[in-house]
Structures are given as C-alpha cells and as structure tokens.
C-alpha cells in the first residue's frame, strides 16, 4: 500500500488493563485509542490504572499490497444489493451475536456524545436498525433518520416497534440526500466496508454535519494473520487504523480519535480483524462543505454485471463471510475452555 496513504498519523497509544469508567471498558484487554500527533494523551487519573505504550507506525507492504481504493466483492453496490438480500434474513440473529453485540454497540456509541434527546441524528448504512436501537436510548426516535441502500435490510428496521417514529429512507452513503449543515450527529456502523470510495463517504459525513457536529464511524480493522487477510481482501474493505485517521483528517475533521472494540471473549481483534473492530470520531470545525475536493464518482452503477462474474465473486464472498462467521464461534468456544486472561 502506498506510503502516501499512511502519513496522516504517526503515533498509536495502546491501553491495556482497565480504562476510565466513562469509557465503560471495564477490564478490557484490547482497548485502545488513536489521537492526532498534536494532541496530548489524557492525564492520569484515579480511574486510569493502565500502562501506555507509544509506538511509531511505519509504512509497510508486509500486510497487504492491495490499495484500499481497489474494490472488493461487496464494495460493488450492485453485488452488495444481492448479497444483502439474502444476508438480511439472518443478519440480526447470526451475524450480530459474534461481531456486533449490544454491549459493543453501546461502548462504540459513547464517543458520539449523544447527550441531547432533541439533536438530529443520521444513521448512515443503518440496515436492520440494530445500531439505531442504541441511538434512540439517548435521542428521540422522531429526530433520527435511518439510511441504507438495501430495501431488504430496511424492511427489518421498519418491523422493529421502537423504530416506528424514525425516518427510514433508501440512499447512498457517498451521495447523501441531506442538505449541508443538517445534522448534529452522523453515525455509521458496519457500512464503510461496502463503500467503493470511503474517502467520498467520509467527506459526505463532514458536509451534512452542523458546525461542532460529530461523526462516529464504526467499522472493521485490517487483520495481520495471513489467512484472515486473504479472506478480508476477497470479501470487503477492512481499513487499517491509519487509513481511518487519514480519511477523517483529509475530509476536514478535527479532534479525530479511534478506539478498538470487540466482544469481551474475543481474542485477536488485530490478528484476525473484526467486522466491528473500531470506533472513529471527528468534530466538524467550520460550517459548510468539506475543504476536500474530489473528482466524479468512479463506480458506474448502471453498468450491468456479467452473470458468471457475479456468480464467481458471490461464491468467493460467501466463502469469506462464512470464515468471518466461524472465527467468532471459534473464539467463543476457546474462551469457554480457556477464559480470557488464563494462560493457554
């Protein structure tokens, strides 16, 4: 991967042990936070009993030479549409329990500062509404808009009684149907991995937020284990942590921060990756559009996909998704035999 993509941040602070109570990461072993180089780490407090390690990240080709801009299987909107037509049937009952639990959701949403029931919130890529259920704990449902490109996923959201007052619309995360300076909060969980152009989607997040508004993007992290890397590259976009930071910075966000998340029993968020592996936030410092100028969209959604090509890619994607369903099951069984914290 080109070094120019990784120059946005040069320090990573890893925190092990217990973290501040306000983060509600009680006893987590794999929590972490990114901060921009110009920011200082939070001062030690009575509640912070942790060891901090600062390392300098280096541009490397050892993880993968495949650029983030090269689309994987379900970074193609047409193919993702059909993929989710089937996945929506089992998404809440099979996918979420291993990758996106209620505890994870609530922890990941905390940095979004959903502290006012009257604030306007857009949930981009909201799908079945699982993340939205966490949002409406803090915000009046009538002030929340769920947007997704999959009508099949949105049908599941519409069927959820607590979401009846939410506005639910079909739309494109890279071309949002909201005016500039519209929302107080932008939330997107488990969606960036399907965007053909992640930078464009994050630029849109900046545009639709009001001055001082905050974006909270929750997504996967790129694995280090070779087999997990292979399936990640086949299936969908698993960004590196440095890439998240750079995308936010380029879009114009300030106070960009990243923290790792994962089920309490999951070992190896960085080794195997995780569909919901980190939460990234940034604040909009000025009104108006993003300072980042981009050319026209590259993806041609009108161009038909050859049936045989689609079938081949669909089968590869299905195999990769099966792998990422089985990894959490393996981790859960492993934790039952050797609880986390015990030597193997």
From Swiss-Prot:
UniProt keyword terms in alphabetical order: Chloroplast, Membrane, Methyltransferase, Plastid, Plastid inner membrane, S-adenosyl-L-methionine, Transferase, Transit peptide, Transmembrane, Transmembrane helix
Keyword Membrane appears in the UniProt entry: yes
Superkingdom classification of source: Eukaryota
Main location (coarse class): plastid
Residue ranges crossing the lipid bilayer per the database entry: 314-334
EC number: 2.1.1.295
This protein's pathway: Cofactor biosynthesis; tocopherol biosynthesis
Pfam families named in the record: Methyltransf_11
Region (SAM motif I): 121-130
Targeting presequence: 1-62
Catalytic activity from the UniProt record: 2-methyl-6-phytyl-1,4-benzene-1,4-diol + S-adenosyl-L-methionine = 2,3-dimethyl-6-phytylbenzene-1,4-diol + S-adenosyl-L-homocysteine + H(+); 2-methyl-6-(all-trans-nonaprenyl)benzene-1,4-diol + S-adenosyl-L-methionine = plastoquinol-9 + S-adenosyl-L-homocysteine + H(+); 6-geranylgeranyl-2-methylbenzene-1,4-diol + S-adenosyl-L-methionine = 6-geranylgeranyl-2,3-dimethylbenzene-1,4-diol + S-adenosyl-L-homocysteine + H(+)
Region named SAM motif II: 166-179
Topology of this chain in the membrane: Single-pass membrane protein
GO molecular function: 2-methyl-6-geranylgeranyl-1,4-benzoquinol methyltransferase activity; 2-methyl-6-phytyl-1,4-benzoquinone methyltransferase activity; 2-methyl-6-solanyl-1,4-benzoquinone methyltransferase activity
Chloroplast intermembrane-facing ranges: 63-313
Stromal side: 335-344
InterPro entries with a match to the protein in the record: Methyltransf_11, MPBQ/MSBQ_MT, SAM-dependent_MTases_sf, SAM_MPBQ_MSBQ_MT
A GO biological process held by the record: vitamin E biosynthetic process
Compartments in which it is found: Plastid, Chloroplast inner membrane
Region listing for SAM motif III, in residue ranges: 207-220
A GO CC term assigned to this protein in UniProt: chloroplast inner membrane
PANTHER family assigned: 2-METHYL-6-PHYTYL-1,4-HYDROQUINONE METHYLTRANSFERASE, CHLOROPLASTIC
Family: Belongs to the class I-like SAM-binding methyltransferase superfamily. MPBQ/MBSQ MT family.
Function: Involved in a key methylation step in both tocopherols (vitamin E) and plastoquinone synthesis. Catalyzes the conversion of 2-methyl-6-phytyl-1,4-hydroquinone (MPBQ) to 2,3-dimethyl-6-phytyl-1,4-hydroquinone (DMPQ, a substrate for tocopherol cyclase), and 2-methyl-6-solanyl-1,4-benzoquinone (MSBQ) to plastoquinone.
The protein's name: 2-methyl-6-phytyl-1,4-hydroquinone methyltransferase, chloroplastic
Lineage: Eukaryota, Viridiplantae, Streptophyta, Embryophyta, Tracheophyta
